[in-house]
Structures are given as structure tokens and as C-alpha cells.
Amino acid sequence: MVQVNNTDAEGRLLLGDLLWYAQLHFKPKRIFDLATLTGAIIIALGKEYAGVFSNNDKFCNEFLNVCKKSNEKAWRLPLDQKFGDALSSSVSDLTNVGGSQGSSIIAAMFLNNFVKKEMPWIHLDIAGVAKNTETTFSRNGATAWGVVSLFEYLREFS
């Protein structure tokens, strides 16, 4: 059971359900999820890098290498139980938000609760890289960040 302490953090509830559902019904070999999950990732990495969280070093390193070749900037952040502890509750299994420090990591740790230990998983927080603002060289709108890297990863490792 999840204690909802912040109704504005609803996306992680849905994403957690989807992660569990996908494992249960589709039996994937690995999982990628991409979400504009936290504004805090913009504070951490700006609008140049996507935040990458993974429970599997090999899978993550393969993907980061593909990102580099694809010119899609990505930076790995830790999945650390110290941050996950911020989700503990005395009245439920966990809460949907933790403290203000490391909140992108805390959000990823929330999602980690819905991923089976043996399932290789990458969470990409793309809040900073998902949208362009209009400049001389770009139009206002979605960037499609991750499409090239995901395609190249699947082509190389599937």
C-alpha cells in the first residue's frame, strides 16, 4: 500500500503500476522506462542531460555507450537505499514522496520498489531534455530525446 503524501507526484504511481504489470504479463528480458518524472532532475543536470538510474551495471553501461554514440547526453545517478529510506512510512508500505534533497533519486527509488530484483531495468528521467525552447537553431516543442538511443540499443543488443 502506498501512502500518498503529494498528489502532484501521481506519475510515479502510474509508472510503478505499469512496471509491475509489464513484468507480470509480458515477461520482458529487460525494461526501459522514460518519463518527465521530476523537475529536480533539471536542477541536477540542466536541460542538457537525461538522468539515468539502473539496477544493472552491464545494462546501464551498454545503454550509456549507445547514448554517447547517438549524441544523446545521459548521466547516471545512484540508486541508493539511503534515499529509498525517505519513502518509509509507519502506516503503509511506502510513501510516494520523500525529502527535498535528492528527490530525483528518491523518485527512482520509489519505482525500484516495483521492479523485480532480477529484472534489468533502466529509468530515464527526461524532464530536462524532453522539450526545446525556441532559439535561432531550434523550434519550440518536443525533442524526441531517447528515440535514437533506444533504437540503436535495440539494434545492437537484441
PLM features per residue range, with description:
Residues 1-158:
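A generic structural signal for tightly packed, nonpolar segments enriched in small/aliphatic residues
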